[in-house]
Amino acid sequence: MNSRQCSFCRAKETKTNPLIAGNSVYICKNCVISAYKILFGEMERESDPLPEEEEGIDYIPTPKELKSALDEYVIGQERAKKVFSVAVYNHYKRIFKKELLEEEDETEISKSNILLIGPTGSGKTLMAQTLARFLNVPIAICDATSLTEAGYVGEDVENILTRLLQAAEGDVKKAERGIVFIDEIDKISRLSENRSITRDVSGEGVQQALLKIIEGSVVNVPPKGGRKHPNQDFVQIDTSQILFICGGAFDGMIELIKRRMGGNSLGFHGDKKGKSEESALLHLVEPDDLVSYGLIPELIGRLHVITTLDEITKEAMLEILTKPKNALVKQYQKLFTMDEAELSFEPEALEAIAELAIKRKTGARGLRAIIEEVTLDLMYDLPELKEYEVIITKECVENRDAKPLLIKKKKNGKKSA
C-alpha cells in the first residue's frame, strides 16, 4: 500500500493528486498550483491559466491521523482528542464522500456538531485551531458573551459567518466547508447570573438565533460585518456543511450531575484525589444536565457529539511548556536566538511557572502571561544581550526583582560567568 504523502500539506498520494518526488521530500499537485499562484500572481495566471483546483479535500485524514496532528500540539486529553478526531472525520467524510452512497439510498447523514466541556485553558480552542490548520479549512472563533439578539448593542449572530467568510478570503464555497468555534457557550444559558432581569439580551434569545445557523440554513451575511440595514449588500452562506464547535467551562455542572445521580458534595475536597473524582464525574454529563444548566433542548439536540476535557495537571503543564511543536519555551528561545542570545530555564523554574498557573486557575492559557512577566526586563534589554546565555531560575519566577544568570559565550564556544 502506497503511504507516501506531501511534505507540505500531508495529503496522501492518489490518482487525482500525484506526488513529485525530491530528495526525501514530496509535493502534491495542489501544492504546486498554490506555489505557482504565489510566485507568478494573478496576471500570469490569467494569461496562461492552470487547471482549477479540485473542490474539497482530496484526501480526508483518518481519525488516527487527525489525533496524531492533535498530539503534536495538545498535551493529554486522550479521550477528548479521540472523540474530536472521529467527529471531525465523520463530518468531512459526510461532505466529500457523498458520491460513494448509492443513488437509490435515501439515507441522509445528519451533521454532527460538537460540544467541548472543560475548564479554562484545557485546550478546547487549541484543538479546533489545530485541526482547522491541519485540514487547511478556514476557522472563525468568537465569544458567545459578545453576541446579542438583533436590536440590542453587541454582535449579531450572523457576524460569526462574516468572520468565517473573511478567514476564507471571501471565497463562499470555502467558507461553507469551514469551522466555527463558539467559546463560553455556557455563559449564555438561561440561568446565567449575568442575565438581565427585564430582558434577555444574551441568553435564550441568542441560543435561538444560534440554533438557526447551527442546524443548517441559508443565511444572509453582511460581508463587512456590522448591523444589518435595508440598503446593505449581503452574501448568502449555506451553513449545512459548516462544522460548529461549542466550548465552555460549565462551572457548577458537577453539582448538577451529583444531584441527578442522587449524591452530594461530601467527600470532594481540593486534593488531587478529589480533583480526579470530579473529572470522572464530569465525563458522565448527559443532555438533561445541560438542559438543567440552562441550554435550550433544541440547541443541545444539534450538538450531537459531547466530550469533556480534564483540568490540566502540573505534570501536563510542564509538558505543555516544552514538548509541543510550538511549545512556549521553544517560542521564547527562538525570540532570543533572533538577537543572537540564548535562553534556558532551570527545571525548578518551569515547575514554579506551572504551579503559579495552577494557583491562578488560568490553565495552560496562563503560562504565556507568566513567562511574559518573567522575561519582560530581559526582552527590554535583549538587543544588548548578544552572545549571552540567559538562565531563568526559580527565584526569577517567585520574585520579580531576582536577576537571571547571565553567561558570556566565548568565541571558541566555551562559556564564562
UniProtKB/Swiss-Prot annotation:
Zn(2+) binds at residues 6, 9, 28, 31. Keywords: ATP-binding, Chaperone, Metal-binding, Nucleotide-binding, Zinc. ATP-dependent specificity component of the Clp protease. It directs the protease to specific substrates. Can perform chaperone functions in the absence of ClpP. The lineage of its organism: Bacteria, Pseudomonadati, Campylobacterota, Epsilonproteobacteria, Campylobacterales. Component of the ClpX-ClpP complex. Forms a hexameric ring that, in the presence of ATP, binds to fourteen ClpP subunits assembled into a disk-like structure with a central cavity, resembling the structure of eukaryotic proteasomes. Residues 1-47 form the ClpX-type ZB domain. This is ATP-dependent Clp protease ATP-binding subunit ClpX 1. Pfam families: AAA_2, ClpB_D2-small, zf-C4_ClpX. It comes from Wolinella succinogenes (strain ATCC 29543 / DSM 1740 / CCUG 13145 / JCM 31913 / LMG 7466 / NCTC 11488 / FDC 602W). One of its GO terms (cellular component) is HslUV protease complex. InterPro entries: AAA+_ATPase (IPR003593), ATP-dep_Clp_protease_ClpX (IPR050052), ATPase_AAA_core (IPR003959), Clp_ATPase_C (IPR019489), Clp_protease_ATP-bd_su_ClpX (IPR004487), ClpX_bact (IPR046425), P-loop_NTPase (IPR027417), Znf_CppX_C4 (IPR010603). GO terms for biological process: cell division; proteolysis involved in protein catabolic process.
